[in-house]
C-alpha cells in the first residue's frame, strides 16, 4: 500500500490568523533594519523557524540563522533583509529574483543540483517526535499511524518516496504548509507524530511547556546550507 497524503490540514481559524500575523511582522521589521544600515540589501527568504529565525519580544528578527546571515553579509558589504516567504514557493522565488537566497534551517541533502549552495555551515538531525506517553518507540512502530510534516520539506520527501526500508508503507502523511501548525496538531492529539528538525522540536517544547518524546533513530542527518539560484553568478556563495 502506498502512503496516503492530504495536501493540507487545517486547525481553527484563530491558529492560522496568529501565524499570519507573525509572518507579516517578520517581513516589515527586517526591511526597516536593512534600509537603516545604508548598505546594499540582500533579501533572505525564510519562514519562521525558532531557534533559527523568529521575532524576539521587541518584534525584531533574531535567531541562529539571523545572526550568522547578518554578520556574513555585513563582511561582504551587504545588509541582510529577512523576508518571510511561502515555503512551498521558495524555489520559484529565488529563481525569479524575488529573494536573493533561501536561508532558514534548509537541508542540502538531495537538493545539491537544484540550487547554488553555500555550506554546509551546520549539521542537523531530522527526527520523529511523538507524545511522551505514546507506544511508538521506533520508526517501525509507525505502521498505521498518522504523521504531520511540512509541505515540500525533507521529511515529507522521505516518507512519500517509500525509499527508506525502516518506514512502514502504511503511514498516513499529512502535509502542512505552516510548520507551527504541525506542532500544535501533535500537542492536541490530532496526529500520532511529527517529523522535523530536532532543534526546532526541542525549541517548541521549551517555549510551550509541552512534553514530546523524540525517537532515538533519526530520519536523516543532514548539512544545512544557504541556497542561491542555480544561475546566480554574483559570487555570494
Give the location of each predicted region.
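N-terminal secretory signal peptides and thylakoid transit peptides that target proteins
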Residues: 2-18
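Ligand-binding cleft/hinge of the Venus flytrap
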Residues: 54-58, 69-78, 154-176, 205-209
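C-terminal motif of bacterial Sec signal peptides marking the signal peptidase cleavage site
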Residues: 25-28
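Bacterial lipoprotein signal-peptidase II cleavage site
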Residues: 30-36
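Periplasmic-binding protein-like
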Residues: 46-48, 123-130, 206-237
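Extracytoplasmic small-molecule ligand-binding "clamshell" domains
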Residues: 36-105, 113, 175
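A ligand-binding cleft/hinge motif common to bilobed small-molecule-binding domains
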Residues: 89-92, 105-114, 158-162, 185-220
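Extended ligand-binding regions for polar small-molecule ligands
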Residues: 30, 63-75, 133-154, 225-237
Amino acid at each position: 500500500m502506498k502512503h496516503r497524503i492530504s495536501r493540507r490540514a487545517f486547525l481553527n481559524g484563530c491558529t492560522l490568523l496568529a501565524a499570519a500575523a507573525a509572518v507579516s511582522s517578520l517581513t516589515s521589521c527586517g526591511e526597516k533594519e536593512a534600509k537603516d544600515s545604508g548598505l546594499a540589501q540582500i533579501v533572505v527568504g525564510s519562514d519562521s523557524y525558532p531557534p533559527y529565525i523568529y521575532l524576539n519580544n521587541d518584534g525584531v528578527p533574531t535567531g541562529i540563522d539571523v545572526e550568522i546571515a547578518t554578520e556574513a553579509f555585513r563582511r561582504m558589504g551587504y545588509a541582510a533583509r529577512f523576508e518571510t516567504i511561502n515555503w512551498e514557493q521558495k524555489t520559484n522565488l529565488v529563481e525569479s529574483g524575488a529573494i536573493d537566497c533561501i536561508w532558514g534551517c534548509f537541508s542540502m541533502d538531495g537538493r545539491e543540483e537544484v540550487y547554488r549552495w553555500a555550506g554546509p555551515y551546520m549539521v542537523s538531525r531530522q527526527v520523529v517526535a511523538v507524545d511522551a506517553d505514546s507506544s511508538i518507540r521506533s520508526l517501525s512502530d509507525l505502521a498505521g499511524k498518522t504523521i504531520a510534516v511540512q509541505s515540500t520539506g525533507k521529511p515529507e520527501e522521505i516518507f512519500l518516496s517509500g525509499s527508506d526500508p525502516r518506514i512502514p508503507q502504511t503511514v498516513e502523511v499529512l502535509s502542512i504548509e505552516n510548520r507551527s501548525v504541525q506542532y500544535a496538531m501533535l500537542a492536541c492529539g490530532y496526529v500520532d507524530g511529527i517529523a522535523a528538525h530536532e532543534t526546532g522540536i526541542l525549541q517548541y517544547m521549551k517555549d510551550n511547556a509541552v512534553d514530546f518524546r523524540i525517537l532515538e533513530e533519526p530520519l536523516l542527518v543532514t548539512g544545512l546550507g544557504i541556497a542561491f539560484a542555480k544561475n546566480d553568478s554574483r559570487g555570494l556563495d
